[in-house]
UniProtKB/Swiss-Prot annotation:
Source species taxonomy: Bacteria, Pseudomonadati, Chlorobiota, Chlorobiia, Chlorobiales
Family: Belongs to the PTH family.
Location of the active site: 19
CDD domains in the cross-refs: PTH
Entry's EC annotation: 3.1.1.29
Predominant localisation class: cytoplasm
Protein name: Peptidyl-tRNA hydrolase
An annotated GO BP: rescue of stalled ribosome
Keywords: Cytoplasm, Hydrolase, RNA-binding, tRNA-binding
Localization (cell): Cytoplasm
Gene that produces this protein: pth
Assembly mode: Monomer.
GO cellular component term, pick one: cytoplasm
Site feature location: Stabilizes the basic form of H active site to accept a proton: 91
């Protein structure tokens, strides 16, 4: 079984914010497979889907972003999933809006949810899909920016980026992280 964990914050006030793009990606995967989310044996929501005969656990931590590792560890323990079989999907302030980047390992890059997962796993060699949300203009507060919603023009790009991210996640499941990196790390932005 593979685990695809989309990071975000619970509560309706955070819905459709830049920081919750990970939730949007796992929501899209569930929608594509006509599945819905249920409460898990831990502080998370989950959905089980199958892609190319591979079972996938979709996960939305309900711990708030900065404690995402608690939910990921709980799901991995309960479902007996190894670190090599997880993909974490999160926002990235350093990548342009419309661009996604798959990585096999690495630092948190300033993303606190990813940082907490690395701390809880005590390793950084697990796959992650970074979804670009970088502003195209100066911002006075990055905290306010990531907790803000996309404007109408950004939303058009974001919708395509969420679809592309869902495709990349399924490619990871079917073919592995190296294959997904080769096919989705093109540096091209989703067209406006």
């Amino acid at each position: 079984m593979k685990l695809v964990a989309g990071l975000g914050n619970p509560e309706a006030r955070y819905e459709n914010t830049r920081h919750n793009i990970g939730f949007e990606v796992v929501d899209e995967l569930a929608r594509l497979h006509q599945s819905s989310f249920s409460s898990g044996k831990g502080n998370f929501l989950y959905s089980k889907i199958i892609h190319r005969n591979e079972p996938i656990l979709l996960l939305k931590p309900m711990t708030y972003m900065n404690l995402s590792g608690n939910a990921v560890i709980a799901a991995m323990t309960f479902y007996k999933i190894e670190y090599q079989d997880i993909l974490v999907v999160c926002d990235d302030l350093n990548i342009a809006l419309g661009t996604i980047r798959m990585r096999a390992k690495g630092s948190a890059g300033g993303q606190n949810g990813l940082k907490h997962i690395i701390q809880c796993l005590k390793r950084d060699d697990f796959a992650r899909l970074r979804v670009g949300i970088a502003p195209d203009h100066p911002v006075s507060s990055y905290s306010s920016f990531v907790l803000g919603k996309f404007n109408a023009e950004e939303r058009k790009i974001t919708d395509r980026m969420v679809s592309l991210s869902a495709e990349a996640a399924l490619d990871f499941v079917a073919h592995g992280v190296e294959h997904a990196m080769n096919h989705y790390n093109t540096g091209k932005k989703t067209q406006q």
